[in-house]
């Protein structure tokens, strides 16, 4: 089968159950374009947004546990033009070949999209853990690919954050933020 073709309610039910049992305060997902137009990532976005609403609604999926209201939803924005330019420049400064030259030459700059980021979470000390998690998806991630061609210390110098867009909040907060739990702490 194809994940992108699974009916929405069927695909969302396991996430509704997980939200109700785990009871998270924050949910992160892809934006409406899936980070880039990838059908499975777009489906992940649709499922996440549906499950966010359904998990809080006692009339939806009552067999999946007590309702739970996630308090904040963020879209992850990992591929901004600004970020890639900064990493490319850092590679050049370090005398390294940037894997992004061709991508940048063909990039369709969309300033409105890059301006959507509301939250930059400093997390460079966890880049190794992030990379190990990515590499665990052996069929999806090329360990010799462009992302892993950039040394972690260069990434940490050029762009030490993961970037998000706050799209739903049930708690008082103000942007910009540097913590996904702002308003909760």
Regions found by a protein language model. Name each.
Residues 5-185:
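Metal-dependent de-N-acetylase/amidase catalytic core
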Residues 1-2:
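A charged helix-plus-loop insertion that forms the helical arch/lid used to bind
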């Amino acid at each position: 089968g194809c994940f992108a073709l699974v009916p929405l309610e069927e695909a969302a039910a396991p996430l509704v159950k997980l939200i109700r049992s785990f009871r998270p305060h924050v949910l992160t997902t892809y934006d409406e374009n899936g980070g880039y137009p990838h059908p499975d990532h777009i489906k992940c976005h649709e499922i996440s947004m549906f499950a966010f609403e359904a998990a809080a609604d006692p009339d939806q999926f009552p067999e999946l546990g007590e309702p739970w209201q996630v308090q904040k939803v963020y879209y992850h924005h990992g591929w901004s033009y600004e970020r890639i330019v900064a990493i490319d420049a850092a590679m050049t400064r370090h005398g390294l070949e940037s894997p992004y030259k061709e991508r940048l030459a063909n990039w369709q700059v969309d300033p409105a999209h890059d301006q959507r980021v509301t939250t930059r979470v400093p997390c460079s000390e966890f880049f190794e853990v992030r990379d190990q998690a990515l590499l665990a998806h052996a069929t999806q991630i090329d360990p010799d690919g462009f992302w892993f061609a950039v040394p972690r210390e260069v990434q940490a110098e050029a762009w030490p954050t993961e970037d998000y867009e706050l799209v739903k909040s049930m708690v008082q907060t103000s942007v910009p933020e540097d913590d996904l739990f702002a308003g909760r702490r």
